[in-house]
């Protein structure tokens, strides 16, 4: 028994002794992940503000697009977004704060209450089967792709695909 323990200890020490201390990992990217995430946030922020006439947002609600969609006109400026919609009066606009941030991905979030967006994500009581249920609207979106002409978003909670086109 003592002989077996000695053999196992010698084998364990031999395995530890054969391990190399010169492990080097190859870099697949030119920059760190934090720097790439910050650069993507800055790029998306600039794209949102760069459209001179704003954006048309095709905003779909409901689980699996079950409740259809609405059109929102959005103009991003600094940290504020001004919106108009077919739900509001012809000359009425609504302003709120927004942010572009990096969580698990680059995200567009409408931070303060804006009834054109948040209405669909707040509990509706008798309007849904669940008294605490919502109409399936998001107010935080993952930015899937972004260019000067088109930004594709995906709702963080319900996963509906939202498209924004530059005007």
Language-model-derived ranges and their functions:
Residues 70-72, 135-140:
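Signature of short aromatic-glycine-proline-rich micro-motifs recurring in repeat-based ectodomains
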Residues 22-107, 146, 158:
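Acidic/polar, low-complexity intrinsically disordered N-terminal segments immediately downstream
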Residues 133-134, 143-145:
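Helix-rich interaction surfaces within compact, conserved domain-sized segments
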Residues 1-9:
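Bacterial N-terminal signal peptides that target proteins for export
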Residues 84-138:
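Contiguous, well-ordered beta-strand patches that form the walls/edges
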Residues 157-167:
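Preference for solvent-exposed, low-hydrophobicity sequence contexts
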Residues 152-155:
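Short, exposed beta-strand-loop hairpins at the edges of beta-sheets
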Residues 16-20:
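C-terminal motif of bacterial Sec signal peptides marking the signal peptidase cleavage site
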